[in-house]
Amino acid sequence: IVTIDAKNVQLADVADVDTLSGSSRIPILFSGPLLHRLGEAFIPALGGCNIGGRPIDFHLETLRKLGATVDKEHKDGIHITAPNGLHGAKIHLPYPSVGATEQTLLAAVLADGKTELSGAATEPEIMDLVAVLQKMGAIISVDVDRTFRIEGVKELKGYTHTALTDRIEA
């Protein structure tokens, strides 16, 4: 059992995120939650993975459409701000990216207003994330045409969930 309690997070130290993430691409997924909690996020320079170089353009464009400002000029990574919070938006992914779908879900659940995400990925891990967010109080519906509708809520609550096994690592 893993228990994560982030209710008192006031700072996300860049060095800690960089050290804990290694060459993982996971830090980009911290952006939405950090923007909601702190009004800013710093994402260290991300590498690729076993697949090769993988741009994060869809992630950044999603955050921009939700109201964030993205500064890619920082020498050590990407600085993202949303001092006035995030807001709902209509977003279309030109490719059903798993990471960009996760990014949109994690950022939109606490955004002010409604978000419509079309062209989304619907892999089992995505549907499991939707189930987790719904257990936490998120309002999300998924249409058969891969369109997600997310109604922002003021807060999420704790939950108990058994995660799926990793299909790639299994």
Residues covered by each model-derived region:
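Structural preference for solvent-exposed beta-strand-turn elements
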Residues: I1-A170
